């Protein structure tokens, strides 16, 4: 099986929640997190909060994404969100959002934490930001905020494949040409493309599935690396030293 087909097949809906993560995985309303997993996520969240700094107003710690839903696969990771009451920072809330976002990136880059082979990704989320995922589980309260629902939505893999190839070609061409403005434009368009899909169709929208494919295949990393290299080149100064 090709890598392309392997990733496409990973988008299929499973019959149960992931049994490594959940007790009673075949009944989402009664499903609870495996104690060993919950304890590990609690420890990781505590480490992340300490890294964010003093005076972090934590309201909850939640698991969201495919491992709290029926669309989990070998490519899944633990999306662990620390819910922060940003209103507590008053007029400095935007400053703290930027700070937490930067620290989130550094934390995830500098750590390689896995549970049962799945990566753990940390986020600091504003309490006012709505939960997009249909499956959201409170680690602190050990219960569902949003109970996951198995969907009967059929994914037209030919349509998805065409959309993926279109974006892959865009990225490959832009990376090959190395035009920083084009690269940044594609990066921004891709972000908006995914968000529009999440807003209109949720996690199983074609836009979000395209984004997931591009991330799992390494295309997004390639795009971001090219943007960074292009920026470095623009900011660098080359000077010929005359004898």
Features from the language model and the residues they span:
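Short linear clamp-binding motif
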Residues: 1-11
């Amino acid at each position: 099986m090709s890598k392309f087909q392997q990733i496409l097949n990973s988008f299929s809906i499973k019959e149960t929640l992931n049994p490594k993560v959940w007790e009673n995985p075949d009944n989402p309303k009664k499903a609870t997190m495996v104690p060993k997993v919950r304890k590990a996520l609690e420890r990781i969240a505590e480490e992340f909060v300490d890294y964010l700094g003093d005076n972090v107003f934590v309201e909850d710690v939640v698991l969201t994404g495919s491992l709290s839903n029926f669309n989990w696969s070998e490519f899944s990771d633990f999306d662990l969100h620390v819910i922060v009451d940003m209103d507590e920072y008053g007029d400095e809330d935007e400053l703290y959002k930027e700070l937490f976002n930067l620290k989130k990136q550094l934390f995830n880059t500098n750590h390689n934490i896995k549970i049962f082979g799945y990566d753990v990704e940390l986020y600091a989320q504003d309490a006012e930001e709505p939960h997009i995922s249909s499956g959201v589980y409170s680690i602190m309260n050990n219960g569902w905020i949003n109970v996951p629902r198995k969907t009967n939505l059929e994914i037209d893999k030919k349509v998805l494949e065409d959309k993926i190839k279109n974006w892959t070609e865009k990225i490959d061409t832009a990376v090959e040409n190395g035009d920083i403005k084009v690269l940044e434009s594609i990066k921004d368009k891709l972000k908006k493309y995914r968000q529009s899909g999440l807003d209109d169709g949720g996690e199983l929208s074609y836009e979000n599935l395209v984004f997931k494919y591009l991330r799992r295949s390494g295309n997004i990393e390639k795009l971001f690396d090219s943007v960074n290299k292009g920026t470095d080149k623009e900011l660098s100064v080359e000077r010929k030293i005359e004898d």
